[in-house]
Amino acid sequence: MSTEQDIKTEEQIPLTYAAVAAPTVQTEGEAVVAPEEPKPKKNWFTFGKKKAAPTDETNIEEGGAPGDEPVKEKKEKKCWWSRCQKGEGEQKEENIAIGVDLVNRDANSMNNHVQLNFEDIFGEADSQHSWDCVWRLNHTVFTAVRLFIYRLVSLLALPFTIIFAIFFGLLASINVFIIVPLGKLLSIPGTLLAKLWNWLIHAIFDPIASAVGLIFSNFNIRKYGINQETTAPCV
């Protein structure tokens, strides 16, 4: 019986059994370690050299060679006069960052009387119009010249700004450190003197004055003329 069972089990084994490799089990000690790349040796003649820049994939996609340097975007050069001219958006951003309002420079509306434009000064009647180019040129020239003169004078007025800053600083320091402390110091005896004077007026002088007024309130004064005739009483 045993021989027949062995023959049956051998017949049931598939033919590909020998071709299938047994799974290999790796333990923790037998883990495969990747070989380390040898580090380049530093010599005295290669110490100051920089490493080669890595190739840019975007440069290769655009059609450049792998060894070529990456293409850098060119920045627009700004002239010195264009740096002073900033848009309203940039001024608002600087206002948020710095705290100086460069857009609304008259927040308290102190100089609304000088806020005059070309339309507030010049005007043509409906019956008489100049050429459009002439009117446009006058508007441009007036605005540009007025702005240039104002900026030039404001630059020349910098010494006056310094002088007024000195005056305001002196007056503010005198007010803070001398006048206000002196006023607070004098308010202590001044309060006592005010209370004493109020008591003297209401307690002594007021009754005396009211009594004298009641005494002399019934007196009548009559004025006589030259012929000793009585006239109307003068009250």
Curated annotation (Swiss-Prot):
Q: Does the keyword Cell membrane apply?
A: yes
Q: How does it sit in the membrane?
A: Peripheral membrane protein
Which ranges does the record annotate as intramembrane? 162-182
The answer to whether the entry has keyword Membrane is yes
- Which Gene Ontology BP terms does the record give? caveola assembly; meiotic cell cycle; Ras protein signal transduction; regulation of egg-laying behavior
User: What does UniProt give as the signal peptide span?
Assistant: none
Span list, region Disordered: 29-72
Q: Which InterPro entries match?
A: Caveolin
Q: One GO CC term of this entry?
A: perinuclear region of cytoplasm
Q: Which residues lie on this side of the membrane: Cytoplasmic?
A: 1-161, 183-235
Q: What is its main location?
A: Golgi
Question: What compartments host this protein?
Answer: Golgi apparatus membrane; Cell membrane; Membrane, Caveola
Describe its assembly: Homooligomer containing 14-16 monomers per oligomer.
Q: What is this protein called?
A: Caveolin-1
List the source organism: Caenorhabditis elegans
Q: What is this protein's gene name?
A: cav-1
